[in-house]
Amino acid sequence: SGKSIHLLLYGILSMQFLFMEMQWINSGCIHSGEYFHGPFEVTDYDVPFMLVKSIGHTRHLDERVENFAKKFTEDLLVLDQKDLDLSTVADEAKPYVAAILTGVVIRHFVEAIAFERGHSLDVRRYMWQMQY
């Protein structure tokens, strides 16, 4: 979850783009506020989760998701924006800057996945390969 709906929507689209389109990993992006409206039913020991804990006013939602998910999966990666050094950023701008930096961290994470899997981020199965 996060401060700006524009950055949130961009983040959701970016994660879908990186994991699904570029790595062919079946995934979904769920706002913490929506998690308990059904998506939490897929939480299981063999289902990996990546949680971005915001520093904004929705952090309590992220913490609620984290507390629940920890009980039912051992494959939970938490990217906590509190771990970012934002000491030189104005307080009112921190949630926005944190959202942007989180996108950079996730991009590097996906690049590492691509390297480990031997699946370049440039490879496409259908896109640009044929008429569709």
Could you say what each language-model-derived stretch is?
Residues 1-132:
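A SIS-like phosphosugar-recognition module
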